[in-house]
């Protein structure tokens, strides 16, 4: 699993629910800035991964299963693979 895939899946889940990422965060009981691009990496450039608790909250808030979230991740992985192939 790649960092970018998880974050893309979260952004996709927000979009699929007609929400900005801040709206998904609020719906999930999280701070509105939780999914800001600026929070996807630490100051030193190290990737910041969303916690299991955060993922659990967005799954519950959007009423999907963990399997559905995994499917979204798989679709985002495929998109990323295609983008990388085209970019070569």
Task: Enumerate the predicted regions with their spans.
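Recognition helix of helix-turn-helix/homeodomain-like DNA-binding domains
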Residues: 29-48
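Short coil turns linking two alpha-helices in DNA-binding domains
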Residues: 20, 31-34, 51, 65
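Short, basic-rich loop-to-helix N-cap that marks the start of a DNA-contacting helix
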Residues: 43-60
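A short, Lys/Arg-rich alpha-helix, primarily the initiator
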Residues: 1-26
């Amino acid at each position: 699993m790649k960092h970018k895939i998880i974050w893309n899946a979260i952004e996709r889940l927000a979009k699929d629910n007609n929400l900005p990422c801040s709206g998904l965060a609020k719906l999930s009981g999280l701070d509105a800035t939780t999914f800001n691009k600026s929070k996807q990496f630490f100051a030193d450039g190290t990737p910041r991964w969303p916690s299991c608790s955060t993922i659990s909250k967005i799954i519950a808030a959007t009423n999907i299963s963990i399997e559905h979230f995994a499917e979204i991740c798989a679709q985002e992985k495929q998109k990323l693979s295609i983008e990388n192939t085209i970019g070569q």
